[in-house]
Amino acid sequence: MNYDLTNPYEIAKYIKEAKKTTPLKVYVNGNLGDCTADDIDCFGTDDFYILFGESDKISAFLESHGDKIKKFKIEQDRRNSAIPLIDMTKIDARIEPGAIIRDKVSIGKNAVIMMGAVINIGSEIGEGAMIDMNAVVGARGKIGKRAHIGAGAVIAGVLEPPSKSPCEIGDDVLIGANSVILEGVKIGANSVIAAGSVVVEDVPSGVVVAGTPARIIKEVDDKTKDKTQIMDDLRK
């Protein structure tokens, strides 16, 4: 079934109807023989095996093979998860370890997603954009080309509470560290948001804003450009 990911109610419906999963990885010390079981992937030989499968299937397998197992260790990183993580194998971008990117996210060429960044369902990351460490792009957030979302910044999502207008960050925008862009706010191209700002209303192109709530303090000038330069080499 197709869902309209521009509509928060459709996203909620998708999450509601998605099959919830609790995948496990299990290390087993024991003699499992050929180690065949429905819906479980088993790798190993002799007395060591690694199992992959859903929690209920794994539990049943471990119980039925209890007399052959000396000990086991379970790794689990989610419970009743509705949305899988994105398949990164075909994305032409730099994605560092520890980034969490949910499925149904668009990531442009040469984008950079740093450690600890979180990108939620329906988001669009433009070509050459950088999502820095521990930054959050909420549901349906739109990040322009070569934009920089600073460490710890939050681009608010529009899933709960539901809103039809997502945050939109224009091309070549720099969002300073630990800034918050509230739901539905649009930031014009080439603007700069000072670190720690809370932006509650739209920002035009080519200005610098700062404060809580954020206010325009000046237009972007040569001095500002020098301090907020986007480095292409980081996107190669």
Curated annotation (Swiss-Prot):
It is an enzyme of class 2 (transferase). It holds the Pfam family DapH_N. GO terms for molecular function: tetrahydrodipicolinate N-acetyltransferase activity. GO terms for biological process: diaminopimelate biosynthetic process; lysine biosynthetic process via diaminopimelate. Its EC number is 2.3.1.89. Pathway: Amino-acid biosynthesis; L-lysine biosynthesis via DAP pathway; LL-2,6-diaminopimelate from (S)-tetrahydrodipicolinate (acetylase route): step 1/3. The keyword Acyltransferase applies. It catalyses: (S)-2,3,4,5-tetrahydrodipicolinate + acetyl-CoA + H2O = L-2-acetamido-6-oxoheptanedioate + CoA. The keyword Repeat applies. Keywords: Acyltransferase, Amino-acid biosynthesis, Diaminopimelate biosynthesis, Lysine biosynthesis, Repeat, Transferase. Gene3D superfamilies: Hexapeptide repeat proteins, Malonyl-CoA ACP transacylase, ACP-binding. Belongs to the transferase hexapeptide repeat family. DapH subfamily. HAMAP family: DapH. Catalyzes the transfer of an acetyl group from acetyl-CoA to tetrahydrodipicolinate. PANTHER family: 2,3,4,5-TETRAHYDROPYRIDINE-2,6-DICARBOXYLATE N-ACETYLTRANSFERASE, ACETYLTRANSFERASE. This is 2,3,4,5-tetrahydropyridine-2,6-dicarboxylate N-acetyltransferase. It comes from Clostridium acetobutylicum (strain ATCC 824 / DSM 792 / JCM 1419 / IAM 19013 / LMG 5710 / NBRC 13948 / NRRL B-527 / VKM B-1787 / 2291 / W). The lineage of its organism: Bacteria, Bacillati, Bacillota, Clostridia, Eubacteriales.
